[in-house]
From Swiss-Prot:
Gene Ontology MF annotations: cytochrome-c oxidase activity
EC top class named in words: translocase
Chain's gene name: COIII
Family recorded in the similarity comment: Belongs to the cytochrome c oxidase subunit 3 family.
Name the UniProt record assigns to this protein: Cytochrome c oxidase subunit 3
Keywords from the UniProt entry: Membrane, Mitochondrion, Mitochondrion inner membrane, Translocase, Transmembrane, Transmembrane helix
Species, as recorded: Metridium senile (Brown sea anemone)
TM segment ranges: 16-36, 39-59, 83-103, 128-148, 160-180, 198-218, 241-261
InterPro entries: Cyt_c/ubiquinol_Oxase_su3 (IPR024791), Cyt_c_oxase_su3_dom (IPR033945), Cyt_c_oxidase-like_su3 (IPR000298), Cyt_c_oxidase_su3-like_sf (IPR035973), Cyt_c_oxidase_su3_a-hlx (IPR013833)
Length: 262
């Protein structure tokens, strides 16, 4: 059956994914409490699997609507851009709270910490070893994703694929180096407020790097399968915005926590 639409908006079909995703988030919340109190992980694992599968199939539907059904008009894409920018703004405020907690504790340390920062007994990481290498890796990935974006706009698909592949590899290298740093760290998350602020701030950033790497890997696969053109590549554009946000957050983490905080 053919139908004529007299407006530029996308009226989405009924979908079960918001409800299923909300259930997954509920399982994660309850599972976290169960894990902290009873060391049982099955509820948390079930929630994580449910939420992950929901994101996969939901975004698959979005890709189908955009690429194969042509439902993403210019007005719809503009709305998606605003949504991505607001999401990044919310992430900025999310990390702002971690920096607030860090500076609240470090600028005027309590007497319980020995009135010094880092607290007594804490041996901070050397900012000019692995953290500096990670900084170079992440900044290089920002340059390569920009190269890939400009290559795609110029119609140079091979260069875009190469640049995006290098970006994904650099993201994986960063994650590996961060895991090695955590494994060899001389303090834990329970070692005073320094350990808690350090691992929460850098840990959430590491999680965002993993999410961004996955985002870019999906864009790479879509680029290989000819789903992006020089004029229609909103998913890639959103992924590059997110990746640059991750770069900027890491610069603040390195300067404030690794260098100044040590």
């Amino acid at each position: 059956m053919k139908s004529t639409v007299y407006h530029p908006y996308h009226l989405v079909d009924p979908s079960p994914w918001p409800y299923v995703g909300a259930c997954g988030a509920l399982f994660i919340t309850v599972g976290s409490v169960v894990y902290f109190h009873y060391s049982q992980t099955w509820v948390l694992l079930m929630g994580a699997i449910t939420l992950s599968l929901t994101m996969i199939v939901w975004w698959r539907d979005v890709i189908r609507e955009a690429t194969f059904q042509g439902l993403h008009t210019m007005v719809v894409k503009q709305g998606l851009k605003y949504g991505m920018l607001l999401f990044i703004l919310s992430e900025v405020l999310f990390f702002f709270s971690f920096f607030w907690a860090f500076f609240h504790s470090s600028i005027a340390p309590n007497i319980e910490l020995g009135a010094v920062w880092p607290p007594q007994g804490i041996n901070p990481l050397n900012p000019f070893s692995v953290p500096l290498l990670n900084t170079a890796v992440l900044l290089s990935s920002g340059a390569t994703v920009t190269w890939a974006h400009h290559a795609l706009i110029s119609g140079k698909k091979t260069e875009a694929i190469n640049g995006l592949t290098i970006t994904v590899v650099l993201g994986l290298i960063f994650t590996g180096l961060q895991a090695m740093e955590y494994y060899e760290a001389p303090f834990a998350i329970s070692d005073s407020v320094y350990g808690s602020t350090f691992f929460v701030a850098t840990g959430f950033h590491g999680m965002h790097v993993i999410i961004g790497t996955t985002f870019l890997a999906v864009c790479l696969a879509r680029l290989v399968y000819h789903q992006f053109t020089r004029h229609h590549h909103l998913g890639f554009e959103a992924a590059s915005w997110y990746w640059h946000f991750v770069d900027v957050v890491w610069l603040f983490l390195y300067i404030c926590i690794y260098w100044w905080g040590s």
